[in-house]
């Protein structure tokens, strides 16, 4: 259990894993003590959709005795190459550009202390976040399909970035354990592009390292993977709890 000193307003920014917030994030939030918190907004970036994640976020808020202020989604370039194709660099940049209006609306809601509009919630959404999510984790979120080529230099980058300490070196080559959350940081940040998942290499993620910055409102789009990189910030009466486990991630920082 961890304790985080916050203002009354908390914004949780997180990727979408299997149409809900990552289990590792919900587990952390369930155990963490948010000292001073009264209201919470959830901001989720995704490759296409968040399903019925709002239902489970609302349950988390109730568990924490926080006023639930809604869940918002921001579509970012797909990076989950275990199942889906990643866009090329130009397409990825266009997706980021197209997300700006939604991001502005999200920021306006937060600034004005308003609830987010209710997201879509149809039968498909409920099915994906409900029935599919646990099956997805059980059947797909595994590390046994990760391999590395002979070009690996044993730099330990993947070991250092893994948020779950699931990678170790054996004879200067990475070995994946069983505790994997499929953040893909080991692939996206391999300096020699040697990490492979079922034949997909790092070059499938062409937005790696690119950043899109906007100065007309307090936002920073970060498409850089960071492994476990939790940042707790208090800015202007709002506390931003950012959980980064994958690329790309959206950070609101001001």
PLM features: what roles do these ranges have?
Residues 75-78, 160-172, 214-224:
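Short, highly charged low-complexity linear segments
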Residues 4, 84-86, 183-187, 205, ...:
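Short low-complexity, flexible loop/linker segments enriched in glycine and/or proline
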Residues 148, 153-181, 185-202:
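Iron-sulfur cluster-binding cysteine motifs and their immediate structural context
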Residues 1, 6-14, 18-135, 139, ...:
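FMN-binding flavodoxin-like domain, especially the glycine-rich phosphate-binding loop
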Residues 193-231, 254:
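Long, positively charged, glycine-interspersed low-complexity recognition regions
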Residues 13, 45, 91, 149-150, ...:
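Conserved short-loop catalytic and cofactor-binding motifs
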Residues 123-156, 160-161:
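A mid-sequence, solvent-exposed acidic-amphipathic segment
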């Amino acid at each position: 259990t961890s304790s985080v000193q916050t203002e009354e307003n908390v914004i949780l920014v997180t990727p979408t894993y299997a149409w809900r917030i990552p289990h590792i994030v919900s587990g952390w939030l369930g155990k963490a003590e948010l000292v001073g918190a009264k209201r919470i907004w959830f901001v989720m970036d995704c490759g296409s959709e968040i399903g019925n994640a709002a239902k489970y976020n609302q349950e988390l808020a109730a568990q924490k005795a926080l006023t639930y202020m809604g869940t918002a989604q921001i579509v970012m370039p797909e990076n989950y190459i275990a199942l889906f194709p990643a866009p090329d660099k130009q397409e990825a940049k266009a997706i980021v550009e197209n997300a700006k209006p939604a991001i502005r609306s999200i920021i306006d809601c937060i600034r004005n202390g308003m609830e987010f509009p209710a997201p879509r919630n149809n039968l498909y959404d409920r099915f994906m976040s409900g029935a599919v999510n646990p099956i997805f984790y059980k059947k797909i979120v595994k590390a046994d399909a990760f391999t590395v080529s002979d070009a690996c230099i044993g730099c330990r980058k993947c070991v250092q970035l893994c948020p779950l300490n699931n990678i170790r070196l054996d004879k200067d080559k990475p070995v994946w354990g069983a505790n994997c959350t499929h953040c893909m940081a080991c692939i996206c940040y391999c300096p020699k592009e040697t990490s492979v998942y079922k034949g997909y290499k790092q070059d499938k993620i062409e937005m790696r390292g690119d950043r899109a910055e906007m100065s007309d409102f307090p936002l920073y789009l970060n498409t850089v993977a960071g492994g476990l990189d939790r940042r707790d910030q208090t800015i202007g009466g709002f506390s931003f709890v950012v959980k980064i486990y994958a690329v790309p991630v959206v950070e609101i920082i001001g």
